[in-house]
Amino acid sequence: MSKSKLKSAQYSINELVKNIKGYSFASKADMRHMLNRCIKDLHEQGYKLGHLNGLKPKHIHTLVDLWKTQGKSTATIKNYMAKLRKVGVLLDKPQLVKSGNDNYQINRRSYVPTYNKAIHQTDFSNCSDPLIRLSLESQFLFGLRREESIKLIISEAWQGNCLRIQPSWTKGGIGRTLNITNEEQRQWLTKAIQQIPAGQSLIPKNKTYKQHLGHYQKQIKLMELSKCHGLRHAYAQRRYLELTQQFDSNGKGLTCPIDGGLSSRQLKGIEREWDRRAREIISRELGHSRIAITKIYLGC
């Protein structure tokens, strides 16, 4: 492996990622990590690229073949392909990666979960850091992603009956509006806005996002929570019941499949329509663009 060419290629990655508009800190870090892995893999395969501009379609095929032999999951391979397509756009090389993954014989991704990942019960008082506790509670109550819950500026986001999530706080730089739908959310906002000065996020003034993220990870470890994404799953599942209860004139609603309810295919008539409408709303509220993603949170 040519160290000088590898360093040069890594520098070109840093420069490219640094100048991407609309990407959050986490999205840029993820992009940088994955592109560096691609370049290292290519060097190990004998392609000593010194710059991202040197990427060609044959290199993409080489990477896909390598990932398959390494046993990488379909989801992981598709994630890499999405990053490489973005590189093609940024470098004005639209032919670098073909538009469809079928061209590379990549299997279709399955969104079917094997178990319920929701964290419905946890004692937030076990968190000794008040800012991190607020972040965790916001994930549970509003379905926020980790980065969103840390960068949240409550005084700016809370607009009466809704919470406006700014693009700069989100994955992919796409903002969204969340309606306040219950008293627990409103009580939390009232409590939180009294604790946090106007204009301040849930990051201490003397720390960067990266520094605070490290502290956050230590705190959730002490709470014996390995991954807090389950708080977001819990939000989606509560919201599914809440929405279908609103659609149901009897107020009974539906339990999502992953929590013991009927699958979408088993539902009949109007109940199937409730399921579709609820999934569309939840997909938007979670910051996703595809309804299929809700299978991860709700089952199918």
Where are the model-predicted features located?
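A short, glycine-centered helix-capping/turn motif at helix boundaries
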Residues: 138-151, 242-247, 286-289
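Conserved tyrosine-mediated DNA breakage-rejoining catalytic core shared by Y-recombinases
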Residues: 151-191
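Short functional hotspots where side chains directly engage DNA or cofactors
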Residues: 163-168, 261-300
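Active-site/catalytic core of tyrosine-dependent DNA strand-transfer enzymes
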Residues: 181-245
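Long, amphipathic, Lys/Arg-enriched alpha-helical "connector/arm" segment
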Residues: 100-131, 137-144, 152-155
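C-terminal/domain-terminus segments
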Residues: 54-58, 187-197, 294-300
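Short basic/aromatic active-site micro-motif
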Residues: 224-276, 288
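N-terminal core-binding DNA-recognition domain of tyrosine recombinases/integrases
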Residues: 14-107
